Each structure stands twice: as structure tokens, then as C-alpha cells.
């Protein structure tokens, strides 16, 4: 019944009295405007469009002389309108700021006194006291026109007020020349439908009818539908703090890599790109928290976008999803390459130069395939906005590939660790034996510190519960707000994701790094490269303590190449002439 959802504008005329003397009018009259000099203009503010008329004239009851001032005022009244205290609240507030204007009427037409008193009484009864403080001071019901006094005004007949927000009577008008415009109640009370053909859909508070399924209700944009405001504040604080720490530590690691690139050759070079991925990953989170919130407040103040019945996918949201998903998979790919390089160095005796020759292949494998999952999610239309974090998500499209990459990396990590232990056991207690043990401990510790939190974050993401909609209500009494979802899975996911990224910067944390920065900052004597110091220290030791080329170094007495690839912070623990590759 399309006619059941029509908004009725009742214009009461004082034909002889007002036309003769224009006395007794308390409505908004354009200053200096005569009966034939009224300047009508289209209503340009989206929040007050669809009232049943589309032309207005200024100044209004608040004294605004342009629509921008009125738009800023209506944006401040959004919480009161969206509270659902009265289904007529939107019409009353908008008509007070954008009165009706038509060439057939000599002055702008405001709402009637009875309508104002009805809406104010309903809101006083249903709205919280803090929301009633938003009631505009310029909207004095006693000063509005009254039909009983033959004053021109707009009134919604009381007999159309039926449960469900659907008027029961046919559209009527009390004035000539004013057309009947059908209008749903979707902006009048919380939970109305977003489209005119769904006007009969009843939804809980902070929900609106789905334009795709008339039996479902979707969350309204920027409202507390599935999560409370405290949950959102907690997640925002957590993301902001961890992202800042992750950005600083990974940036420090990147600067260290850049300052001394010769210290970090293969097989440890993939850590550089692992840090780069998480540095950019933290930047994405920081951008969404800092700039997105500012843009959201700007939209509320200037455009009233909170009046939208539902949250749609926006280009910034999609961009954040593609970027974070891509960087997550790139990081998992570089973790796999990192473990693979150590495996090839320790088990297959690949040299650093051999791994360097295949760096191009590593880059292709790490940067190109991760594009597929987020693009597939977009093509399959599986991306949804997240109410809790304000970012977009597509469950399973990133988590499952990342989990596979992490498990493959764990396999090569275990194989590499076993090979390192076997090689270490072949050495007698010498300087090389001690340094080799340090390499293995550092490799295993770093792998554990990265794999554990990152895998925990992926598992938490798989366990996270998402909700897109709720069933529509059959009667107003059944429209109860759903129980808020738990925010713990999302908070755990965010925590472990950013902690895992932060710990990637630990690879450069060593005494050599401290000495290098101290020398560069001129804190001790003449600045000297730590690389030169290491070379001098290595030259002062006998070669038999640095290379494993003699029979006395092996328990079996055989001459075997022990290690061909790892040069941990320039500790020379292998003989390049013994490389098989």
C-alpha cells in the first residue's frame, strides 16, 4: 500500500482575513517581501529533502539568511531526530529551518502550533533529558501560527498516526496549488526503511530497512547498532597506541637497514621488507583513526550525513581494506621467504650471493600474488564495512591464505633450525661455535616472536563474529535492539596483528646497532663504522677460529662445508670458497 506511507501536508488558509490585512501572522515572513516578491529556492540540504515540498524561502525562524547556516543548525539536531522520540520530529525541525515556499502563497509557511506541541511532548516523554537539551531555542511553540486564528501553517492530521509509521488516510491539502508529495517515515524515527517501497518495514532502534531484502534491517551509519560506543572507543584507543608503537619501531629498523645495508644481506634481508610491510600497515591504521574521524566530524557538521539510513561502502573504506589486506599477505609472504632463505643457507648450503641472484624472484612472489585475495573479495562483493573499527573486511579472504603462508614458513623454520643445530654440533668449542650458536638462538627467537602473535591474530580473525543485518519486526513491540556483539575477538586480532608487526623491528636490536648509532652521533671519539671495527677484530684472530676448513674443527675429521649463507651482523662463520652454489 503505497498510499499508506504518504506524508500529508495540511495547509490551513485564512482566505479573507489574511488576504485583506495580513494581520495576526506569527510565522516566518521574509523581511521586506511582499505578496508578489517572495523568492523561492530549492532545498539543497539532503537531510531535509523529501518533506513533501522542495522549495523554501529565507530567513527562517532562526533568522538564517542562507541555507549553509540552516544546514549547520540541522546537523546539530541530528541526535534528537535519530533518537526516535517522535516520528514527526524531522518534519517539524526541518520545516522550522526550511519553511515551505510556493508562488501561490504570499509568505513562507511554517508548522502549526499543535504539531510543535505534539512533537515536543512526545520527545519530552521518550527522549533522554540530555537530548532534550538540543531542542532549539528559536522553536517556541507558542509563537507558531494556529489554524483557529485563521493563520497559515502546515499540520499533519492526527488520524494518520498509526503504529508502524504508516498514515492511514489519503493525501489531502488545504491550499490550492500545493501538490501532494508521497514521503516515507524513514527519517522520522529510528528504524524506518530507507526506500519508499519499504515504508512498512519496522526495524529496531539504530537500524533501517534493507534496500535489498525487505525482511532485513541494516545498521544505520555511525550509530551504535551491534557495538556500543565504549567498545568503539576502546578499539580506537588500542589501534592508535599500537599503530604508533609499530610505526616507530619498524621505522627505526628501516633506517638501520638503510644506514648499513651491507650488514643485512641474505638470508636475513627479507626482514627488511617484512618491516616495510608492517610500517605501511600501521600507517593505514593511523590514517583511518586520525583523518577518518576528522572527516566524519566534518561530514556531520556540514552535510548531515548521519541522516543516511545505512552505511554503504565508500572509496576510503575500500582503499583501506585493499591496502591492509595486501600488506598482511605480503608480510606473510616475506616471512615464508625469510624462513626459506635460512633453510637454503643451512640445509642446502646456498651462499649469500646465490640467494641474492634470486632476489628478483623473491620480490615477484612476495608482491604480486597477494593482490589476488582482496581483488577477488571485491569482485565477489564480499567486502562489508565494520561498525567497530570503521574499516572494511571480507571474512576468510585474507586469513586463510595468510594462515597457509605462516604454516609453510613454520615448516621451513623448523627445518632450518634443525640444520643449524646439526651444523653447530659439528664444531668444536671455538669462537665460530659460539657465534654459530648465537645465530641459531637469534633466528629461533625471532621466528617464535613473529609467528606466535601473527598466527594468534589470524585465528582470532577467523573466530570473529560479524553481523550485517537483523530480521525486521512484525510489530512495534517486537522491535528490541539486538544484544551487542563481543568486541574481544576484534581487539585480540588487532592487538596480535600490530604486536607481531612491532616485533619484526627487533631483528636490528643488538649491541652492534647501539655502537653504530653512537658512533654516528659522535658520542664517542672519532666516528668509525662498526663494519670497519668488526673487520679489524676479525683480522686480529687466527683464521682457524673463523673458518671451518681444518680437520681438527670437525668431530669426524672430514672436510665439509659447514655453512655457506648466514653472515649474522658480519660475523664471518663460513669460507666463501667452500660454497657449493
Curated annotation (Swiss-Prot):
Organism name: Drosophila melanogaster
Organism classification: Eukaryota, Metazoa, Ecdysozoa, Arthropoda, Hexapoda
Record membrane topology: Multi-pass membrane protein
Family under the similarity heading: Belongs to the G-protein coupled receptor Fz/Smo family.
SMART domains: FRI (SM00063), Frizzled (SM01330)
Statement: the UniProt record of this protein carries the keyword Mitochondrion: no
Its job: Receptor for Wnt proteins. Most of frizzled receptors are coupled to the beta-catenin canonical signaling pathway, which leads to the activation of disheveled proteins, inhibition of GSK-3 kinase, nuclear accumulation of beta-catenin and activation of Wnt target genes. A second signaling pathway involving PKC and calcium fluxes has been seen for some family members, but it is not yet clear if it represents a distinct pathway or if it can be integrated in the canonical pathway, as PKC seems to be required for Wnt-mediated inactivation of GSK-3 kinase.
Top-level taxon of origin: Eukaryota
Tissue: Wing, leg and eye imaginal disks. In embryos, expressed is seen in brain, proventriculus, Malpighian tubules, anal plate and visceral mesoderm of parasegment 8.
UniProt free text on domains: The FZ domain is involved in binding with Wnt ligands.
Any one biological process term the GO annotation gives: non-canonical Wnt signaling pathway
Protein name stated in the entry: Frizzled-3
Disulfide-bond pairs as recorded: 40-101, 48-94, 85-123, 112-153, 116-141
Signal sequence, start to end: 1-19
GO terms of molecular function: G protein-coupled receptor activity; Wnt-protein binding
Keyword tags: Developmental protein, Disulfide bond, G-protein coupled receptor, Glycoprotein, Membrane, Receptor, Signal, Transducer, Transmembrane, Transmembrane helix, Wnt signaling pathway
Domain FZ per the UniProt entry, residue ranges: 35-156
GO CC entries: extracellular space; membrane
Motif (PDZ-binding): 579-581
Cellular compartments annotated: Membrane
Annotated glycan sites: 54, 206
Extracellular-facing ranges: 20-237, 292-321, 381-393, 464-488
Amino acid at each position: 500500500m503505497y498510499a499508506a506511507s504518504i506524508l500529508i501536508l495540511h495547509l490551513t488558509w485564512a482566505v479573507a482575513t489574511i488576504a485583506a490585512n495580513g494581520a495576526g501572522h506569527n510565522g516566518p515572513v521574509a523581511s521586506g517581501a511582499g505578496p508578489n516578491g517572495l523568492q523561492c529556492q530549492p532545498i539543497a540540504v539532503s537531510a531535509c529533502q523529501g518533506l513533501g515540498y522542495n522549495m523554501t524561502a529565507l530567513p527562517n525562524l532562526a533568522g538564517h539568511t542562507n541555507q549553509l547556516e540552516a544546514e549547520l543548525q540541522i546537523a546539530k539536531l541530528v541526535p534528537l531526530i535519530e533518537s526516535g522520540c517522535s516520528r514527526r520530529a524531522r518534519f517539524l525541525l526541518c520545516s522550522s529551518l526550511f519553511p515551505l515556499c510556493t508562488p501561490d502563497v504570499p509568505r513562507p509557511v511554517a508548522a502549526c502550533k499543535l504539531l510543535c506541541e505534539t512533537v515536543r511532548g512526545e520527545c519530552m516523554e521518550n527522549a533522554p533529558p540530555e537530548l532534550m537539551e538540543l531542542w532549539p531555542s528559536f522553536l517556541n511553540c507558542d509563537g507558531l501560527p494556529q489554524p483557529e486564528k485563521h493563520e497559515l501553517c502546515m499540520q499533519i492530521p492526527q488520524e494518520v498516526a498509526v503504529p508502524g509509521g504508516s498514515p492511514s488516510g489519503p493525501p489531502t491539502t488545504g491550499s490550492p496549488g500545493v501538490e501532494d508529495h508521497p514521503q516515507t517515515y524513514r527519517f522520522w524515527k529510528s528504524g524506518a526503511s530507507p526506500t519508499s517501497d519499504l515504508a512498512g518495514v519496522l526495524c529496531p532502534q539504530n537500524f533501517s530497512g534493507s534496500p535489498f531484502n525487505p525482511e532485513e534491517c541494516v545498521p544505520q551509519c555511525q550509530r551504535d547498532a551491534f557495538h556500543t560506543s565504549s567498545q568503539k572507543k576502546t578499539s580506537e584507543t588500542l589501534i592508535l597506541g599500537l599503530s604508533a608503537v609499530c610505526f616507530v619501531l619498524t621505522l627505526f629498523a628501516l633506517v638501520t637497514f638503510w644506514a648499513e645495508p651491507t650488514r643485512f644481506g641474505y638470508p636475513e634481508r627479507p626482514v627488511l621488507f617484512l618491516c616495510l610491510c608492517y610500517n605501511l600497515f600501521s600507517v593505514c591504521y593511523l590514517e583511518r583513526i586520525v583523518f577518518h574521524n576528522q572527516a566524519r566530524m566534518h561530514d556531520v557538521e556540514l552535510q548531515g550525513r548521519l541522516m543516511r539510513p545505512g552505511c554503504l561502502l565508500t572509496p576510503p573504506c575500500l582503499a583501506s581494506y585493499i591496502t591492509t589486506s595486501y600488506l598482511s599477505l605480503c608480510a606473510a609472504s616475506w616471512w615464508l621467504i625469510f624462513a626459506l632463505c635460512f633453510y637454503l643457507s643451512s640445509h642446502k648450503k646456498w651462499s649469500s650471493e646465490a640467494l641474492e641472484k634470486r632476489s628478483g624472484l623473491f620480490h615477484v612472489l612476495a608482491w604480486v600474488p597477494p593482490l589476488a585475495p582482496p581483488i577477488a573479495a571485491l569482485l565477489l562483493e564480499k567486502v562489508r564495512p565494520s561498525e567497530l573499527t570503521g574499516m572494511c573486511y571480507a571474512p576468510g579472504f585474507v586469513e586463510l591464505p595468510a594462515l597457509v603462508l605462516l604454516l609453510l614458513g613454520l615448516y621451513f623454520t623448523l627445518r632450518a633450525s634443525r640444520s643449524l643445530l646439526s651444523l653447530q654440533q659439528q664444531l668444536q668449542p671455538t669462537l665460530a661455535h659460539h657465534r654459530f650458536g648465537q645465530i641459531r638462538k637469534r633466528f629461533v627467537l625471532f621466528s617464535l616472536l613473529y609467528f606466535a602473535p601473527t598466527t594468534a591474530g589470524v585465528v582470532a580473525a577467523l573466530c570473529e563474529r560479524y553481523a550485517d543485518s537483523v530480521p525486521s519486526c512484525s510489530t512495534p513491540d517486537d522491535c528490541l535492539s539486538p544484544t551487542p556483539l563481543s568486541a574481544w575477538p576484534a581487539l585480540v586480532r588487532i592487538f596480535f596483528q600490530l604486536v607481531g608487526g612491532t616485533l619484526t623491528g627487533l631483528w636490528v636490536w643488538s649491541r652492534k646497532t647501539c655502537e653504530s648509532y653512537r658512533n654516528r652521533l659522535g658520542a664517542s671519539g672519532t666516528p668509525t663504522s662498526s663494519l670497519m671495527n668488526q673487520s679489524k677484530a676479525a683480522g686480529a684472530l687466527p683464521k682457524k677460529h673463523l673458518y671451518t676448513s681444518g680437520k681438527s674443527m670437525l668431530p669426524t675429521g672430514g672436510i665439509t662445508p659447514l655453512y655457506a649463507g648466514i653472515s649474522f651482523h658480519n660475523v664471518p662463520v663460513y669460507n666463501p670458497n667452500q660454497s657449493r652454489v
